Amino acid sequence: MLDKLGQNLSDALNKIKNATFVDKKLVKEVIKDIQKALIQSDVNVKLVFNMSKEIERKAIEEAPPKGLSKKEHIVKIVYDELVKLLGETTQKLELDPSKKSVILLIGIQGSGKTTSAAKLARYIQKKGLRPGLIAADVYRPAAYQQLKQLSEKINVPLFGDETRTKTPVDITKEGMEKLKKVDVIIIDTAGRHKEEESLLAEMKEMKDLTNPNEIILVIDGTLGQQAKNQAKAFKESVSEIGSILVTKLDGSAKGGGALSAVAEINAPIKFIGTGEGVDNLEQFDPKKFISRILGLGDLDSLLEKTEDIMDESTEESIDSILKGKFTLIELYAQLETISKMGPMKQILSMIPGMGGNLPKEAAQLTEDKLKRYKIMMDSMTLEEKENPELIKTSRLQRIAKGAGVKQDEIKDLLKYYSTTKNAFGNLKRGKMPKMGGQMGQIMRQLMYKD
């Protein structure tokens, strides 16, 4: 997410981290690099200038607090100021499990509202609540079908009018009646602009009808600074906007501009879309977000993701590993778990030291290797999976042919298995593998070509 911005900011801070001596000249040079990175991400020039002055003042005038070196203190100053730029505090979606809640999604056409409705339903579902969806957009021909496909994928009830003959208000009224058994109703409304008075009037009518607990404005992250005007316009026309959901941050060069622009008008950003899948919606936490951008990691989110995909088979696999059993069967289960966690680039950005320094091809190569490793193991017999040491020349040839790969790739898999087994062995003995040691070796083997 925001790869170029993260890389540029990390490069700037590395000048501080790698310097023998930090003086005023170096501080100014680093600040110039930070300015350039933020402006390229479409952050408002005035905001960047004000933030830069504050970083320079603190870096030059303030003495590092006890326990921090001068370098660490400057990195923390930059981190704190970037967090401030994005709104500082985390705004959570508050839902009362004892009462039915209603969420109204609004935004212009093309902002990713319909996909966000399904993502939000999935997010709520993972919190243990029962969501339901209402497809109230009758103006865009594919809106109902799109939401229907997504709702079926996540097993969430949907109410809508496939014929598009009913009004959004009538659909919403009927939907509220039909979805009595759910805990949270999410309404996907039609895309609109501030000039469309009839649509705005319709939206206000739906607001009065549903009395929503929260109105969420969905904004396209590729808009950059323009997001400010859009958020402002909707805030003026619908005064009760509860929060903002910013989409398409995974591939946007202007994502930083969009986030800072929305934060500037004090509209709380509660969610960000980080990919196309229904699970790619995150609660927005400025501190965690900046940590990942700067390559400092986000272990809390990584643990949350791990908990989300834990099932009985995963737990059995972990139990086997902790008892000292680690065969290719356990390795396969671990690769399955990693695959379920989401895009590899996103996962790696949560590991301290990996985010901003991640080579461009590394994440894709990692995903490709994981897939190939699984294909290779699918070509093995149960005996071979349980006893990898049996895989010698003749078996290597057969497995390689069955998987459609070279024998060297099977050897690469067995090497990865051996490294991982040793790392888990150390974990069992109470030793934590470090990124520079065996854990680093595991990641490097996945990320780089031999």
Curated annotation (Swiss-Prot):
Record Gene3D superfamilies = P-loop containing nucleotide triphosphate hydrolases (3.40.50.300), Signal recognition particle SRP54, nucleotide-binding domain (1.20.120.140), Signal recognition particle, SRP54 subunit, M-domain (1.10.260.30)
Quick one: which residues bind GTP? Answer: 107-114, 188-192, 247-250
Keywords from the named record: Cytoplasm, GTP-binding, Hydrolase, Nucleotide-binding, Ribonucleoprotein, RNA-binding, Signal recognition particle
Q: What is its main location?
A: cytoplasm
Q: Which GO terms describe its biological process?
A: SRP-dependent cotranslational protein targeting to membrane
Instruction: Give the Enzyme Commission number.
Output: 3.6.5.4
Q: Which PROSITE patterns match?
A: SRP54
Q: Which GO terms describe its cellular component?
A: signal recognition particle
Q: What class of enzyme is it?
A: hydrolase
Does RNA-binding appear among the keywords?
Answer: yes
- Tell me the InterPro entries matching this sequence: AAA+_ATPase, P-loop_NTPase, Signal_recog_part_SRP54_M_sf, Signal_recog_particl_SRP54_hlx, Signal_recog_particle_SRP54_M, SRP/SRP_N, SRP54, SRP54_GTPase_dom
Q: Which GO terms describe its molecular function?
A: 7S RNA binding; ATP hydrolysis activity; GTP binding; GTPase activity
Subcellular location per UniProt equals: Cytoplasm
> What's the short name of a Pfam family annotated to this entry?
SRP54_N
Task: From the UniProt record, list the reaction(s) this protein catalyses.
Answer: GTP + H2O = GDP + phosphate + H(+)
Under SMART domains, the record lists: AAA (SM00382), SRP54 (SM00962), SRP54_N (SM00963)
Give a short account of what the protein does.
Involved in targeting and insertion of nascent membrane proteins into the cytoplasmic membrane. Binds to the hydrophobic signal sequence of the ribosome-nascent chain (RNC) as it emerges from the ribosomes. The SRP-RNC complex is then targeted to the cytoplasmic membrane where it interacts with the SRP receptor FtsY.
Describe its partners and assembly state.
Part of the signal recognition particle protein translocation system, which is composed of SRP and FtsY. Archaeal SRP consists of a 7S RNA molecule of 300 nucleotides and two protein subunits: SRP54 and SRP19.
Swiss-Prot/TrEMBL domain comment: Composed of three domains: the N-terminal N domain, which is responsible for interactions with the ribosome, the central G domain, which binds GTP, and the C-terminal M domain, which binds the RNA and the signal sequence of the RNC.
State the family it belongs to: Belongs to the GTP-binding SRP family. SRP54 subfamily.
Protein name per UniProt: Signal recognition particle 54 kDa protein
Species this protein is from: Methanococcus maripaludis (strain C5 / ATCC BAA-1333)
Query: What gene does this protein come from?
Result: srp54
